């Protein structure tokens, strides 16, 4: 089960709409309690993809290292990554699957014509295929 604090969800949506028509990206921070992952904050990062950023995103290894450091210094867990799919549904592509790390949550936001159209979260299963995560409604901190 994935729970997202309302403020974190609002920040992801704002980032995704502002980046349109490009894909935005960032990190999910929070904590794990039993089988529940609770996203308490996000951190937007620069889409490091060279060239056309409308259909692809990339997070630099430097940003990953800084995110791990930030999580450790703030007693948080790095739970995963979010990114937007401009004018496409919130379903992972094969490129998303190939770049995915095990145990991470991957939130995809669908932005259609500069409007938020929905979000879904995914995790790799044992066969390295994406499965949709169950989510609770946005929660207040």
Where are these regions (language model features)?
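Conserved, mostly hydrophobic/aromatic
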Residues: 81
């Amino acid at each position: 089960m994935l729970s997202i604090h309302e403020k974190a969800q609002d920040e992801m949506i704002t980032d995704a709409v502002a980046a349109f028509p490009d894909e935005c990206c960032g990190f999910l921070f929070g904590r794990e309690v039993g089988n529940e992952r609770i996203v308490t904050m996000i951190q937007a990062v620069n889409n490091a993809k060279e060239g056309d950023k409308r259909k692809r995103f990339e997070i630099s290894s430097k940003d990953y290292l800084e995110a791990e450091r930030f999580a450790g210094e703030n007693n948080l867990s790095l739970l995963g990554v979010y990114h937007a799919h401009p004018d496409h549904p919130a379903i992972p592509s094969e490129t998303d699957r190939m770049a995915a790390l095990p145990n991470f949550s991957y939130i995809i936001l669908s932005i259609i014509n500069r409007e938020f159209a929905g979000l879904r979260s995914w995790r790799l299963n044992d066969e390295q295929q994406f499965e949709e995560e169950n989510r609770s409604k946005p929660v207040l901190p």
